[in-house]
């Protein structure tokens, strides 16, 4: 049976009120041509409408491409995601209560697909406890329109767990590279597998239809079965991209690179250096927590500088990982975020989060935006600015050793190091250490329950988490504790009896 269909025929499979699962990580494995087609169909006909959309990672280019191209009031009734990827139309809909919006951890959503594939009704996990995902706080609800409880607190053998509901998926919209006439899908040009296979299996187990966007159609005789990632039994319709350079990009920044596809390694890519500024100071202090051979996850922003500092310090054998499923190699940032070059392996995203949730990471280096006196951290929402947690909650609740990296203030901070002292030239306008934060993405209380080792590194000092909260353990040379640390905080912390100076070598250009 030839499953190759036109775009319009594929969209006809989507009915009003369907629950749709979308694959993708930014634009990697994102079926953008189909998403654009759905948006155009709705604008022209008013259908399909009332959809419930699930996605794991943020899907788009953080501007004007991706799920935002089908984010219209009426088209999407409910939106469940780990990250909004700066989807401004959807954020506006959420703020106006024109959509029921939920924000759950990326690993949890990827595991919902796998649970559905096995016809299991729930994902039971400790991920999300005591964060905004916990029903004792917000239950993952982004707005007032989100009335239904999709997560429940339960106890098993007197231990707390969260029970996330597994929906019945009607439609899966995923992406591969090549299809044969039976619908067998290979992914040789994609940056990684991400959640395409898990979504296909979840949808078929639910009795739904799976639509796959590809670049190529070939005869089954020409496909090596070892290359097939999604068997044709999971596929109902195959749509060939008519404009692959526009709609079938490996990443927002790259149409196609064989190195990003993992076809061979290249010495052209290297971990780039970082100019001497606050980021480099923080990264240099952070790598003091790093050991050779460590398996690591780096968050976006300042933590990305950790890999550069490690190379500079001669720590070259750390194993970097990416939430999308890549292990080893050099993770890429910016418009290629979520991909890597010279990676050792590519796992399905759900399997990567199995590894994370099991405590497989030796260290995680992540950013912070707001922190309260208890040590709770917010990175997911700031008033009307809705970002999402991504994989932050999965990682910070599962990694034994966590290093939070960030400046004391933001929006205008300038420093220099002279005469052996760190000098604050101008303070940032935005305080990060606040009496109250907008929501809890990292729970210090849960961290203590999990017996994690947590420190927080800034350009001017270091805090450690202990059973009583935060304690100041290190200060940069030249920094006045009262005016330049506590003076830019809404609260005070305890000061260690063994307070020490940060190593002066950290500040050498």
Protein language model regions, located:
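Conserved phosphate- and dinucleotide-binding cores of soluble alpha/beta proteins
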Residues: 3-12, 26-44, 54, 60-70, ...
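Glycine-rich phosphate/diphosphate-binding loops that line cofactor/substrate pockets in enzymes
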Residues: 6-19, 167, 285-295
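Generic N-terminal amphipathic, Lys/Arg-enriched alpha-helix
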Residues: 14-21, 262-272
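Nucleotide donor/acceptor-binding cores
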Residues: 18, 47-51, 77, 293-294
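Short glycine-rich or small-residue beta-strand-to-loop segments that form or flank ligand, phosphate
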Residues: 19-24, 52-55
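Glycine-rich phosphate/ribose-binding loops and adjacent secondary-structure elements
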Residues: 49, 272-276, 280-291, 295, ...
